């Protein structure tokens, strides 16, 4: 099999990708048998290409799966941990913008009764 390009894989359905993955794995096992039995050098160099192709197919499968999960959980209140933004621990525990703006009744009353004084400077 020739080297597979990831952009060609992205248009395919999951069933097609899984079938291609199985084909590549079978081919890899055949190449490994050829290696043990003393096969041609061309077959030995092909092992690397097939391994990388398997990795490409798996990468595309995983990326599309994660993309679909992101679409599913978009707008929902709770998301799985691996779909949440990766921040530092401190940033995750920080108050939200809304929580920071909240004021107690006492604080609201004080601000209403004693507004900030504005002074005019005589020039």
UniProtKB/Swiss-Prot annotation:
Q: Which Pfam family, an example, fits this chain? A: Ribosomal_L29
Kindly give the InterPro entries that the UniProt entry links to this protein.
Answer: Ribosomal_uL29 (IPR001854), Ribosomal_uL29_CS (IPR018254), Ribosomal_uL29_euk (IPR045059), Ribosomal_uL29_sf (IPR036049)
Q: What is its main location?
A: cytoplasm
Report what the protein is called: Large ribosomal subunit protein uL29
Q: Does Metal-binding show up as a keyword for this record?
A: no
Q: Where is this region: Disordered?
A: 100-123
Supply the Gene3D superfamilies for this chain: 1.10.287.310, 6.10.250.3450
Q: Where is this cross-link: Glycyl lysine isopeptide (Lys-Gly) (interchain with G-Cter in SUMO2)?
A: 25
Report which superkingdom the organism of origin falls in. Eukaryota
Q: Where in the cell is the protein located?
A: Cytoplasm
Question: What function is annotated for this protein?
Answer: Component of the large ribosomal subunit. The ribosome is a large ribonucleoprotein complex responsible for the synthesis of proteins in the cell.
Q: Where are the transmembrane segments?
A: none
HAMAP family per the record?
Answer: Ribosomal_uL29
* GO CC annotation: cytoplasm; cytoplasmic side of rough endoplasmic reticulum membrane; cytosolic large ribosomal subunit; cytosolic ribosome; large ribosomal subunit; synapse
Query: What are the protein's UniProt keywords?
Result: Acetylation, Cytoplasm, Isopeptide bond, Phosphoprotein, Ribonucleoprotein, Ribosomal protein, Ubl conjugation
Give the record's subunit note.
Component of the large ribosomal subunit.
Keyword Ribonucleoprotein applies: yes
